[in-house]
Amino acid sequence: MIPTGLLIVDDEPALLGLLRRYLERLGYDVETCTGSTEALARFQAEPDRFAMTITDLSLPGMSGEELIGKMRELRPQLRAIITSGYYYEPLAEAVGFLQKPFLPQALAEAIEKARS
């Protein structure tokens, strides 16, 4: 089975709720987590569910970049987008970067770009 889920990680619950509602209306299977430890546990429980993770760079516990690395130990082909309020030069771990604040439509476009 081809994974289709999106795992979105950010320590701002209001932003997570907004993105979840928007992306679900577009037909995505969305799971949200407010921390890296919770996200890693969720991913480890269902690694074949998620096609992509979208994570904030600055998270309590471990950075978004570290989180992506740990997830890719289980699924090397996992696609990823990092978000941050600070400029960030994406490394090999990420296929995309979105500077905060961003519009939900910009995230949808970044997801489509990362999927292709």
What are these regions (language model features)?
Residues 35-38, 63-66:
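Acidic catalytic/metal-coordinating carboxylates
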Residues 102-115:
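C-terminal output helix
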